[in-house]
């Protein structure tokens, strides 16, 4: 019988040391003195630092693989009851952890986020396949060149039943009746996925093995690292493999199992170098040394230094195993016999037997160690995993809302579908008009954006008044000479006043039209963005709506521009109500004469224009009227021009867009054409629905997990 997973007493070997070790029966990887209850009983160099999770039995690490299946004797009969109880606790507490992650992986959740896993990497001919064979109890593809051409998820489940296997990839599921079928089915799967050549693929192959002779463990086997392309391989095959490996080992959720032969310089191995690149402190990397029987004499101490973490430090340390070699396979050495030979090798080796005593050697202890590490890793990852699933689910739901519902096939249903789409769009346009749309914290509403342009219009009007004041003397003198008639010196010439007013009001037309243009662009872009938000996935409908928005904008722009120009033509009438003008005139006159009274106190040499008192009187009087009139006109224009813009470019523009959208419903023959989706929209919607479904299932699985403390 081959390997079996159960507690076993093992006689500890006498270590090569001057210190005396009494001979006693203990579990074969327990270290004296034992840790207190609640801590993992782990060998030196790879003691797990955290306390035991609540769902792990305190003596969890006393479970191991029994390579020899000895006859039950008196002492062992006495411990059978406690052993069975311990194993039952294991079945109840530990297996669900691995099953949970395997179920999430089976749902396809790994497409959306990284799951806790153990990834196995190694250079070509490192002995990686032999290690996996020893753990799984089945023969895997072997040979020269690239053998593993797709990531292989190896799910091992210990159960008291007949051996069963199942291989799954793409939409294919193949039940396996006995272990001998595994190698051929894996090769077949790789050829289907990656082709019959020597290329690789990122697509997963899932291999499930259920047997009483395997540990509870899930591993991901990755292609061996190669440096040089051979035969029909792509020239960049080495880069392709590294990219595939890095995709897995760079995830913080992955424990990296790096397989390295004992008979090579560990510093030159590509696998360990890649692991160090993504995990520089070795927090989640375990080194596995293979082929200890091929170590040259005199170099054994170098291997021991590696195992003692003195050569290439890894926080989780190293394990060492001796698996079947090519000669063993040729001689058809069974895995069970290979396990017994491995134990004998370490028991009798003058240098390496201490590693067996320390619990760092043999495949059974490696299996136990990996199971322990995986359980710890899963427990630590569960709270983060729950948050990630929740966030991904929310994002996918929000994204799906943007794509809307599936388009109905029935013509009557299409009408209601289109009505609903237009209704929601029109509601958003209405909110834009009323200044009630929902915006992000860093954004502002449409009405506020337009109001900012109106604020700049106030500045333009104020600047224009100041400009008139600054050149009043020069302008009035010029126009007095041109338009003065028979009136006596000092009288105000109305023609001069009127001409100055018309001239400076005329300079406001272009700024007003530019403000109209800016406001139009703001509204137009906002309406376009709203249309894109609602109709982007319906290319014909979206284009139709964009055209209508463009046509309406052009007409509204022309009407608003005409009305603004009409307003300025009316301003040439130079009119203001007597009651209003009289009040403003008196206030301005009072302000000006008060300022002139102060100015008269200054030396006359600084006011050359005061030499002609009659001219002063005329200029001051016209200045009073110009200031009064421009103040009142500016008030009128400050409101009137924004009124025109807001009415034509926002209010009426929005109303006409809404009516134009409703008119689309009258053309019943074009419903199918209008609702024609972009080629990838249906695919995206389907993808998001599937993603939401599997994330919902994942949330449910976590919720139902009895030991989850999230």
Curated annotation (Swiss-Prot):
Residues 322-325 are annotated as: G5 motif. It is found in: Cytoplasm; Nucleus. Interferon-induced dynamin-like GTPase with antiviral activity against vesicular stomatitis virus (VSV). One of its GO terms (molecular function) is microtubule binding. The gene is MX2. Residues 221-224 are annotated as: G3 motif. Residues 619-710 form the GED domain. GO terms for biological process: defense response to virus; innate immune response; receptor internalization; response to virus; synaptic vesicle budding from presynaptic endocytic zone membrane. This is Interferon-induced GTP-binding protein Mx2. It comes from the Eukaryota. GTP binds at residues 122-129, 221-225, 290-293. PROSITE patterns: G_DYNAMIN_1 (PS00410), G_DYNAMIN_2 (PS51718), GED (PS51388). Induction: By type I and type III interferons. Residues 1-51 are annotated as: Disordered.
